[in-house]
């Protein structure tokens, strides 16, 4: 059923899968000189109540636990750093980054499947989203088995699909004209639509949270190209999602304004073109604002992640 999804959604799913696969590959083969980072303070500053900060391994320093400082000789005390927390960054790649990328892929795959099912059987405000139910897998399988095994034509399933298409058209009309009454009469239907939207939102949030690898303490030991690839993949998915959200709206506006533009002359065409552009730009701005708010929320969480890791 996934193969019938919109091409942009399938492309997003492919990019997410490549992102998760590349993350797993890097976590397996990455050659990190020292994959552990430490939240440490120089000896003496810990007694003054200083706040520890994350740092990469320093071969000239001596890392000790807070309860081991008394055993140090005076010659080593200048090189001693008191460790309050540490993190294995290779394990971080597997336990946090890869899991988030895999969860994002699974949620988006579930969204694509749910949307595909709704395009066949469920309501849409835009009829252009409809897929013919005759392409349903069970309908095709029933007709093929009847023709090859039994040697006859089987049309009952096709009739049932046609009835579903009629029912879908009626529900879509109610969704456009009176969504509140539709929600009251068919709460399960609205719940399934909200579940579909929730799957997509959850996939986006999980994907954007993977940006934590560029700001987490482990970013100190990851090379620049690895952090750049994370941003490239996430921004590519964000751009494709923005494109998938705006292209249907552009097509609807273009289709609605095509006839007046041809019949009213140059002035009408200019007015329609201006209205079309303003509507499209407003939609793009709204989607971009939503994307910025989502990224901002994730980055705000990552800003406090260091303190949560050290003191929580």
UniProtKB/Swiss-Prot annotation:
<dbReference type="GO" id="GO:0044175">
    <property type="term" value="C:host cell endosome membrane"/>
</dbReference>
<feature type="transmembrane region" description="Helical">
    <location>
        <begin position="92"/>
        <end position="112"/>
    </location>
</feature>
<dbReference type="GO" id="GO:0039700">
    <property type="term" value="P:fusion of viral membrane with host outer nuclear membrane"/>
</dbReference>
<feature type="topological domain" description="Cytoplasmic">
    <location>
        <begin position="249"/>
        <end position="280"/>
    </location>
</feature>
<keyword id="KW-0472">Membrane</keyword>
<feature type="transmembrane region" description="Helical">
    <location>
        <begin position="188"/>
        <end position="208"/>
    </location>
</feature>
<feature type="topological domain" description="Cytoplasmic">
    <location>
        <begin position="113"/>
        <end position="187"/>
    </location>
</feature>
<keyword id="KW-1039">Host endosome</keyword>
<keyword id="KW-1133">Transmembrane helix</keyword>
<feature type="transmembrane region" description="Helical">
    <location>
        <begin position="228"/>
        <end position="248"/>
    </location>
</feature>
<keyword id="KW-0812">Transmembrane</keyword>
<dbReference type="GO" id="GO:0016020">
    <property type="term" value="C:membrane"/>
</dbReference>
<feature type="glycosylation site" description="N-linked (GlcNAc...) asparagine; by host">
    <location>
        <position position="67"/>
    </location>
</feature>
<keyword id="KW-1032">Host cell membrane</keyword>
<keyword id="KW-0325">Glycoprotein</keyword>
<feature type="glycosylation site" description="N-linked (GlcNAc...) asparagine; by host">
    <location>
        <position position="58"/>
    </location>
</feature>
<protein>
    <recommendedName>
        <fullName>Envelope glycoprotein K</fullName>
    </recommendedName>
</protein>
<keyword id="KW-1188">Viral release from host cell</keyword>
<feature type="topological domain" description="Extracellular">
    <location>
        <begin position="209"/>
        <end position="227"/>
    </location>
</feature>
<keyword id="KW-1043">Host membrane</keyword>
<dbReference type="Pfam" id="PF01621">
    <property type="entry name" value="Fusion_gly_K"/>
</dbReference>
<comment type="subunit">
    <text>Interacts (via UL20 interaction region) with protein UL20 homolog (via N-terminus); this interaction probably plays a role in the coordinate transport of protein UL20 homolog and gK to the trans-Golgi network (TGN), and is required for the cell surface expression of gK.</text>
</comment>
<feature type="transmembrane region" description="Helical">
    <location>
        <begin position="281"/>
        <end position="301"/>
    </location>
</feature>
<feature type="signal peptide">
    <location>
        <begin position="1"/>
        <end position="20"/>
    </location>
</feature>
<dbReference type="GO" id="GO:0060141">
    <property type="term" value="P:symbiont-mediated induction of syncytium formation"/>
</dbReference>
<keyword id="KW-1181">Viral primary envelope fusion with host outer nuclear membrane</keyword>
<dbReference type="GO" id="GO:0020002">
    <property type="term" value="C:host cell plasma membrane"/>
</dbReference>
<comment type="similarity">
    <text>Belongs to the alphaherpesvirinae glycoprotein K family.</text>
</comment>
<feature type="topological domain" description="Extracellular">
    <location>
        <begin position="21"/>
        <end position="91"/>
    </location>
</feature>
<dbReference type="InterPro" id="IPR002567">
    <property type="entry name" value="GK"/>
</dbReference>
<keyword id="KW-0732">Signal</keyword>
<keyword id="KW-1040">Host Golgi apparatus</keyword>
<keyword id="KW-1180">Syncytium formation induced by viral infection</keyword>
<dbReference type="GO" id="GO:0044178">
    <property type="term" value="C:host cell Golgi membrane"/>
</dbReference>
<feature type="topological domain" description="Extracellular">
    <location>
        <begin position="302"/>
        <end position="312"/>
    </location>
</feature>
<comment type="function">
    <text>Glycoprotein that probably modulates membrane fusion events during secondary envelopment of cytoplasmic capsids that bud into specific trans-Golgi network (TGN)-derived membranes.</text>
</comment>
